[in-house]
Amino acid sequence: MTSACGSDVDVFVVDKDGQPVADVAVYAMRPGEQNDLSAPTASAVMDQIDQQFVPHLLVIQTGTPVEFPNSDTVAHHVYSFSHPNKFFLPMYKGEQHPPVTFEHSGVVSIGCNIHDHMLGYILVVDSTTYTKTDKNGKASLSLDNAEDYEISIWSPRIRDVDELLSKTVVMSGNPGSEVKFHLSKKLSPPHGGQSGSMSWSEY
């Protein structure tokens, strides 16, 4: 959406061969934005379907409660060792646990203590402006024309160094800007949800 004081910025993410990369988190931050964020007004959901976390990657604002319903017929024990957002939801089916509120920004790796092949991620950001790329590697952000922003991307598959995953965008005088991230390193394989060892990015 574009308002009288805002413009849509299209963000494109492509791999080292120029192919679009889907399901990449994209978010924009203004200088000092983390100090004046309003409290989230809605919760988010990460379901458990066919022994997989759905969505595999969830992006939320700091302070957002996340529900972890279990839509499978088998029990799950959901947990994370990611500091400082550690949590444990003992074995359950259905919706037996209250939402978990994530008060700290960063990457949260999610697992199941019963099914080791289950792996999901929550990216907690100090921003109200975030989304994910579609199958064409495209995401759109509605930004204030009077502000400067740092646009960043993240995915568990990306191996490029962090310094290459953020770009500054000057909105004044640049309505309808485009930002392109051309990754230089080969992506990690997508998580297939098959049995095997887990890979934790943070403990």
Where are these regions (language model features)?
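A short, amphipathic beta-strand motif
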Residues: 9-15, 26, 68, 137-139
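A short, solvent-exposed beta-strand micro-motif common in secreted/extracellular proteins
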Residues: 26, 65-70, 108-110, 114, ...
